[in-house]
Amino acid sequence: MRFTSCCGAVLICAGASVAGAQQFPPEQIKEGAAIYAKHCATCHGNHMKNPPWAIDLATFPRDERARFVDSVTNGVRNMPPWGDVINPEGIAALWAYLVDGEK
């Protein structure tokens, strides 16, 4: 009984992590790539491999979407705010590109 309960808990957790995986439509990723190339690559690098002065987006935590949205919208440290330039849909597309675009 105990073994069955433990196996069930493991399977539930494994299913939750797969179910929680983010998947984005290819069009959204493509839009995010275009926005990234236009507004972000200068500082963050062509493939999210940053120069020494910017955060390495290739390793940005994929479970911190809210932090990403806030940083892009309002700026953080030396990064200017982009909320007046990139609309919420564009920021969502950037997130899709960050998560799924550079595999």
PLM region spans:
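Bacterial N-terminal signal peptides that target proteins for export
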Residues: M1-G8
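Disulfide-bonded cysteine motifs in exported proteins
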Residues: G8, I35-K38
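A cross-family signal for key residues in well-ordered alpha-helices
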Residues: V10, V69, W95
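Electrostatic cytochrome c docking/interface patches
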Residues: C13-I35, K103
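Gly/Gly-Pro-rich "capping" loops immediately C-terminal to redox-active cysteine motifs
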Residues: P26-A33, G45-V76
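Short cysteine clusters
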Residues: C40-C43
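Axial heme c-ligation environment in periplasmic c-type cytochrome domains
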Residues: P51-A58, T73-K103
